[in-house]
Amino acid sequence: MNDSQAIIEEAFERRAEISPRKAETLVKDAVEEALHLLDTGEARVAEKQNGEWIVNEWLKKAVLLSFRLSDNVFIKGGYTNYFDKVPSKYADYSSRDFRQDEVRIVPPASVRKGAFIAPSVVLMPSYVNIGAYVDRGTMVDTWATVGSCAQIGKNVHLSGGVGIGGVLEPLQAKPTIIEDNCFIGARSEIVEGVIVEEGSVISMGVFIGQSTRIYHRETGTISYGRVPAGSVVVPGNLPSQDGKYSLYCAIIVKQVDERTRSKVGINELLRNI
């Protein structure tokens, strides 16, 4: 445990006492350092170790403490003004800074300070919240939202209007995670710490939370909270036991390997179901 982590852990236990005018400089500095680590990608709220996603709870605590340490302030935007506790990531960026980061940010995309945007990411008019991590080569399309602490992998496509849910509390809960090389179709919602594993294709209009049934067509089994690697998922319904009604579910219609996915377009995968 480093010094900043220890300070944040201790301060979080008495967070009800903390306010912008009632906090030690030591705590403010530790939180600021943690947010800097998140902002630059040197640390992340969750990381994959030995095939499992591990949550760094102290970084979540730092984000939550930052809300208690900050007043709302006037924030000037290109077309309007704002009033919030968290500054914009790019408020002080110059043209040189953007070129150095190798990112493309289309107005009026909004990224909060404390989110990491990797090189070669394209943000169409979209929103990325504090603590989020967006890895290389990812496209965040128009009106898509990436929630607090969400983890987005390399070469992911978040289509128009996609919602990736944020998870700050409970602290031990995994954030919503979209692994490398996934495609999330327009207006789909992945929330509540659901994990979409590498190379999966989510069709348009699929909604998956922790209580959503995920039906595997090939095996007839039902699972929750995780989409296995290489899955092709569409929206559907399952009948009730008495046959009187049906309820929504997400259906895994097939699973494909990387070789198949590289040869076959996304539309082809979704048509041949």
Curated annotation (Swiss-Prot):
One of its GO terms (cellular component) is cytoplasm. It comes from the Bacteria. This is 2,3,4,5-tetrahydropyridine-2,6-dicarboxylate N-succinyltransferase. Pathway: Amino-acid biosynthesis; L-lysine biosynthesis via DAP pathway; LL-2,6-diaminopimelate from (S)-tetrahydrodipicolinate (succinylase route): step 1/3. Pfam families: Hexapep_2 (PF14602), THDPS_N_2 (PF14805). The lineage of its organism: Bacteria, Pseudomonadati, Pseudomonadota, Gammaproteobacteria, Chromatiales. GO terms for molecular function: 2,3,4,5-tetrahydropyridine-2,6-dicarboxylate N-succinyltransferase activity; nucleotidyltransferase activity. InterPro entries: DapD_Trfase_Hexpep_rpt_fam (IPR005664), Hexapep (IPR001451), Hexapep_transf_CS (IPR018357), THP_succinylTrfase_dom1 (IPR023180), THP_succinylTrfase_N_sf (IPR037133), Trimer_LpxA-like_sf (IPR011004). GO terms for biological process: diaminopimelate biosynthetic process; lysine biosynthetic process via diaminopimelate. It is found in: Cytoplasm. It is an enzyme of class 2 (transferase). Its EC number is 2.3.1.117. The gene is dapD. It catalyses: (S)-2,3,4,5-tetrahydrodipicolinate + succinyl-CoA + H2O = (S)-2-succinylamino-6-oxoheptanedioate + CoA. Homotrimer. Belongs to the transferase hexapeptide repeat family. CDD domains: LbH_THP_succinylT. Substrate binds at residues 104, 141. Keywords: Acyltransferase, Amino-acid biosynthesis, Cytoplasm, Diaminopimelate biosynthesis, Lysine biosynthesis, Repeat, Transferase.
